[in-house]
């Protein structure tokens, strides 16, 4: 298994041939198959003797890959898709071939140095001080959880007798905040948004002050959302930051999708207040054109995160010095250098190219909204703020939305699953792929 034989060399050529073809070609949309269906075709792929590299690659390329929806298809506008740059995808091959460990500076100094430069760019465009720092983790769920654990540790120092800890967030906050609260065994204070559907400081202040005055529960973190998954709305971060500072509460910004807009001049004003965050996350695998999976987690004062997350054991003592070890800043020890493909693409293309590509998603959303507003069967939920457009089909039941979505995928036109807003079924386009065109949008709208 560990010798580079002629068979391995042939397999390497086949892998590269497939990878290059996948990068050069228009991506297929494809779609899922049932487990029973896949098993009927493939049987058990794990055998005592093994299938051999050539045959196993064939199993993947001819069957398994086709049973996965391509997130980079230009008409995959579901959830928050992904559109990695060609450079980032190619460099992911290099990372995989290099056996790099990204948990410590001692073992991965060069790779960690590069990751930190990509993090530094995010810190700079957010407006945090140069002393801020961060780490790439698996995704937004792990990033939010890691930051909130640090926030609670800080609150414990000043309020050791608190009965129950509480996270204050919007009723529209991402599901990962609820997940973090469950894992941490803390409560959620879900606060209604204002008439613009934004969480603001006034609403949060009222809710927190009432909670603190009437219970022995205490809010240890306020979570603002910078680009909600459903509608792409940016909370009033500036007023949230003031409310948090006045009450000595940690301010965390979940920007997994939307904080990529920091590099787009046309919407930069929406993020006023993020510079006052104690921590934030943004996922390069969403709108910054990196492959899965990479979430950038940033702390204003990273030494606080190091206090919380550094693991101690006799076999780890050699790592405990002043060098920057990523394992000290989140809930992980073993980690791949998942930020490297993002760093490579960012370094190679330059930040101007990123600004242009993000602006393209914003333009697509605005132009699509105009088409939807003019469509006799459709109605906008609201004007797009970032790159998500939400709308309804007049007269449809929830079942009809789902039937349309299923048929669209079956016909390989696109992947647009329905969502919900205010209890009603909606459709939404999430534009993160610069290859999506208005012709693609029109093709989908023609089916409505």
At which residue positions do the language-model features occur?
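Conserved PLP-binding catalytic core of the aspartate aminotransferase-like
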Residues: 379-408
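N-terminal entrance/gating region of PLP-dependent enzymes' catalytic architecture
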Residues: 1-131, 412-414, 425
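Active-site C-terminal subdomain of aminotransferase-like
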Residues: 228, 272-373, 383
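Short loop-beta-helix segment that forms the pyridoxal 5′-phosphate
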Residues: 122-146, 191-192
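Conserved PLP-enzyme active-site core in the AAT-like
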Residues: 142-306
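PLP-dependent enzyme catalytic core of the Aspartate aminotransferase-like
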Residues: 421-448
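Conserved PLP cofactor-binding pocket of PLP-dependent enzymes
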Residues: 383, 388, 411-428
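A short linear hydrophobic-aromatic micro-motif
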Residues: 132, 219, 376-380, 413-418
């Amino acid at each position: 298994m560990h010798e580079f034989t002629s068979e391995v060399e042939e397999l390497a050529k086949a892998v590269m041939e497939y990878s290059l073809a996948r990068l050069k070609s228009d991506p297929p949309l494809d779609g899922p198959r049932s487990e029973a269906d896949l098993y009927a075709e493939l049987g058990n792929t794990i055998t005592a003797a093994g299938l051999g590299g050539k045959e196993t690659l064939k199993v993947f390329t001819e069957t398994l890959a086709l049973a996965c929806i391509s997130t980079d298809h230009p008409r995959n506008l579901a959830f928050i898709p992904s559109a990695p740059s060609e450079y980032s995808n190619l460099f992911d091959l290099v990372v995989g071939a290099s056996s790099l460990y990204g948990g410590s500076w001692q073992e991965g100094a060069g790779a960690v140095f590069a990751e930190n430069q990509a993090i530094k760019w995010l810190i700079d465009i957010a407006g945090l001080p140069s002393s801020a720092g961060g780490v790439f983790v698996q995704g937004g769920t792990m990033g939010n959880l890691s930051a909130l654990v640090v926030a609670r540790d800080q609150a414990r120092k000043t309020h050791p007798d608190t009965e129950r800890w509480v996270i204050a967030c919007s009723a529209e906050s991402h599901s990962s905040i609820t997940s973090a609260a469950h894992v941490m065994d803390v409560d959620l204070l879900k606060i209604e948004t204002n008439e613009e559907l934004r969480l603001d400081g006034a609403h949060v202040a009222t809710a927190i002050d009432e909670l603190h005055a009437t219970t022995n529960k205490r809010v240890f973190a306020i979570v603002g959302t910078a680009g909600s998954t459903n509608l792409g709305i940016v909370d009033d971060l500036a007023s949230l930051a003031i409310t948090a500072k006045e009450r000595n509460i940690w301010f965390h910004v979940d920007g997994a999708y939307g904080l990529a807009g920091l590099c787009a001049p046309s919407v930069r004003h929406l993020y006023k207040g993020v510079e006052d965050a104690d921590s934030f996350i943004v996922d390069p695998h969403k709108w910054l054109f990196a492959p899965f999976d990479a979430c950038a987690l940033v702390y204003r004062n990273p030494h606080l995160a190091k206090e919380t997350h550094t693991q101690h054991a006799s076999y780890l003592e050699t790592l405990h010095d002043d060098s920057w070890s990523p394992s000290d800043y989140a809930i992980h020890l073993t980690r791949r250098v998942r930020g490297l493909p993002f760093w490579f693409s960012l370094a190679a293309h330059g930040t101007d190219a990123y600004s242009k590509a993000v602006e393209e998603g914003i333009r697509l959303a605005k132009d699509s909204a105009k088409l939807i507003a003019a469509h006799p069967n459709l109605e906008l939920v609201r004007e797009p703020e970032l790159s998500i457009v939400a709308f309804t089909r007049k007269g449809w039941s929830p079942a009809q939305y789902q039937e349309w979505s299923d048929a669209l995928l079956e016909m390989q036109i696109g992947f647009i699953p329905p969502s919900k807003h205010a209890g009603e079924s909606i459709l939404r386009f999430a534009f993160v792929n610069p290859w999506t065109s208005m012709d693609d949008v029109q093709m989908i709208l023609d089916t409505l």
